[in-house]
């Protein structure tokens, strides 16, 4: 008997401690960008029982009441009761923010391409150098309507549904912290065939019984989100498998910005360069170039030029032009990868300033990305999720 071809991804809710930290960092970023679009921000957050620490490097003309932003973010997530060990009213907020290093700033504010010309700017998009070295990946597949791998897409939707049911009051015993995990079985041709296993752990009131949690999660969450044709009698369900999840959120575990980078991206289906997103402005290519790489990959697949596309970009700190661009279509390309790479160079400007201009990234749009994934979102409008380069790519390739 042959083994099944299985792939698993997970997601976490907005009340998960790491996601609380991400949302605080991005809320602070947005508050600063609303006043100063050209601010340089690298904001980290640690949350644990009764305490939030905010630290990092920021260069801005804006004034932001950091503690107020922190409390409002926690309130919006749903930590409003001191019985949970963490609530927006009583939490202690400690802020330690300093100015960005001048050594880094000189390379970001004036890229090597400008410095090599003794400050004489030829192309204004050469002005901004990458905020750091590193490699970033973008991915897209026609496996789902949102051009995302199925396992991570379903995982995000499950925890988002839990949050919606909690906030609407339909399931009154739900609390903010939750996790999901979905295992998808693929056929021998690499096509998603069925959902093999679903794991959901959700924080709950002490009065809730395991039976009602199990029934509600199966009927109001899983069956509401996962298409019936993907579920069968062999699908396995693990609902709160420890048997109890009353202590959760920052009371149960500490949380840190940037610790859910696989949840934020493709659920492990594609490589990750290692850099986190939240709390970083668009001069940080960890964030902006990852968004650009997704934008490129999604437009390639949406144009029908490949069934799957993976883009790798890399940068040197203080240099505008990428040090490398790589495209991989896993044998699904309708044109060669070399032809695609040439088309990418013509259609997309992948210098930091080019990305910022192309995707309009100086706006306070980041808080909405800090939970439920940065890619494949259908509930919010994100510039890197647009497929507005499809026709231009086709034209360049003569399609």
Swiss-Prot record:
Pathway: Amino-acid biosynthesis; S-adenosyl-L-methionine biosynthesis; S-adenosyl-L-methionine from L-methionine: step 1/1. It comes from the Bacteria. Its cofactor is Mg(2+); K(+). One of its GO terms (biological process) is S-adenosylmethionine biosynthetic process. ATP binds at residues 16, 177-179, 244-245, 253, 259-260, 276, 280. It is found in: Cytoplasm. Residues 100-110 are annotated as: Flexible loop. It catalyses: L-methionine + ATP + H2O = S-adenosyl-L-methionine + phosphate + diphosphate. It holds the Pfam family S-AdoMet_synt_M. Its EC number is 2.5.1.6. GO terms for cellular component: cytoplasm. K(+) binds at residue 44. L-methionine binds at residues 57, 100, 253, 284. One of its GO terms (molecular function) is magnesium ion binding. Keywords: ATP-binding, Cytoplasm, Magnesium, Metal-binding, Nucleotide-binding, One-carbon metabolism, Potassium, Transferase. Mg(2+) binds at residue 18. Catalyzes the formation of S-adenosylmethionine (AdoMet) from methionine and ATP. The overall synthetic reaction is composed of two sequential steps, AdoMet formation and the subsequent tripolyphosphate hydrolysis which occurs prior to release of AdoMet from the enzyme. Homotetramer; dimer of dimers. Belongs to the AdoMet synthase family. This is S-adenosylmethionine synthase. It comes from Lactococcus lactis subsp. cremoris (strain MG1363). The lineage of its organism: Bacteria, Bacillati, Bacillota, Bacilli, Lactobacillales.
């Amino acid at each position: 008997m042959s083994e099944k071809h299985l792939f698993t991804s997970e997601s976490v809710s907005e009340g998960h401690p790491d996601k609380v930290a991400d949302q605080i960092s991005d809320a602070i970023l947005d508050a600063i960008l609303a006043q100063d679009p050209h601010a340089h921000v690298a904001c980290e957050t640690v949350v644990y029982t009764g305490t939030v620490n905010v630290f990092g490097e920021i260069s801005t003309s804006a004034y932001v009441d950091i503690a107020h932003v922190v409390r409002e973010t926690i309130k919006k997530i749903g930590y409003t009761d001191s019985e949970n060990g963490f609530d927006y009213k009583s939490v202690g907020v400690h802020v330690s923010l300093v100015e960005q290093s001048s050594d880094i700033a000189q390379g970001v504010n004036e890229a090597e391409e400008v410095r090599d010309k003794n400050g004489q700017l030829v192309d204004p998009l050469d002005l901004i150098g990458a905020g750091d070295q590193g490699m970033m990946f973008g991915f897209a597949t026609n496996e789902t309507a949102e051009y995302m791998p199925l396992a991570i897409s379903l995982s995000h939707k499950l925890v988002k549904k839990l949050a919606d049911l909690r906030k609407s009051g339909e399931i009154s015993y739900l609390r903010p912290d939750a996790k999901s995990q979905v295992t998808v079985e693929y056929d021998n041709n690499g096509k998603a065939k069925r959902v093999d296993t679903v794991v959901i752990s959700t924080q709950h009131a002490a009065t809730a019984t395991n039976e009602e949690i199990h029934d509600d999660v199966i009927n109001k969450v899983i069956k509401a989100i996962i298409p019936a044709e993907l579920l069968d009698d062999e699908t396995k369900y693990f609902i709160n498998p420890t048997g109890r999840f009353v202590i959760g959120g920052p009371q149960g575990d500490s949380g840190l910005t940037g610790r859910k980078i696989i949840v934020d991206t493709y659920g492990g289906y594609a490589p990750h360069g290692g850099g986190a997103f939240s709390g970083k402005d668009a001069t940080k290519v960890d964030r902006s170039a990852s968004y650009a790489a997704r934008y490129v990959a999604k437009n390639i697949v949406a144009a029908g030029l490949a069934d799957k596309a993976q883009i790798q970009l890399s940068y040197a700190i203080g240099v505008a032009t990428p040090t490398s661009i790589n495209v991989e279509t896993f044998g699904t390309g309708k044109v060669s990868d070399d032809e695609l790479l040439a088309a990418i160079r013509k259609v997309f400007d992948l210098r930091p300033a080019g990305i910022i201009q192309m995707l309009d990234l100086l706006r306070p749009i980041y808080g909405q990305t800090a939970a439920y994934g940065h890619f494949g979102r259908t509930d919010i409008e994100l510039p890197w999720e647009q497929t507005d380069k499809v026709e231009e790519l086709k034209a360049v390739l003569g399609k």
